[in-house]
Amino acid sequence: MMTEQVVYLNGQFVPLSQASVSVLDRGFIFGDGIYEVIPVYQRKMFRPQQHLERLTRSLASVGIDNIYSNEQWLQIIANLMEKSEGSDLLVYIQVTRGVAKRAHAFPLNTKPTVFIMVNAMSGPSKEMRERGVACVTMQDMRWLHCDIKSTSLLGNVLAAQNAAQHSALETIQFRDGFLTEASSSNVWIVKNQTLLGPQKNNLVLEGIRYGLFEELCAKHEIPFEMRAIAQDEVFSADEVLLSSATKEILP
């Protein structure tokens, strides 16, 4: 008999069925929160410090207190992983501004709601890695702070649904004729043996694999450049790649 999944909520490890938050939590009312996702391979977290640094940046950018140090986050996650089954896992962290009377402006003296869960991660199939995946395109209609890993993801949800309705894995988005990113992935192109990626700015979320791509290209002497990439360049690319915590790197 399988034991019930255990999650972390506001300082307590509790069964998932017993975890609950107020309906007045600003994450529920406004999507006023930040999240982070850390992949785990063979029970070892992938670049945890970089993920936690991004969490810290996103929290600071919207004025939500980060109530834990990186060391405390890592200890909580390690404790939760001990209560979780499996070898390859996905750690989901969510921090909202907390519970307050409904009003748009930031409330005073609220305590952030902290939620963490660990789920099994299967990763892309061998066929997906070898044959590639289907993508569709659309105009990027999201807000102008996509560099913040916000829980307000309706634009991303609509883009993902657009892909699902066309039997594709992802929707690659363009803003004003230039590549931004997919619904939940960064997008890269290969042209003339050079790896190209969009510039790091407010229109894209800087995936943790940005740094990995830079390191691998430097190590293997592969030309690498980050710049504005026109839509026509994507359609004429020698190869298009997706990268994310769950998709890893996919053609």
Question: Which role does the model predict for each range below?
Answer:
Residues M1-T171, R175-F178, N201, Y210, ...:
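Conserved alpha/beta cores of soluble small-molecule-handling proteins
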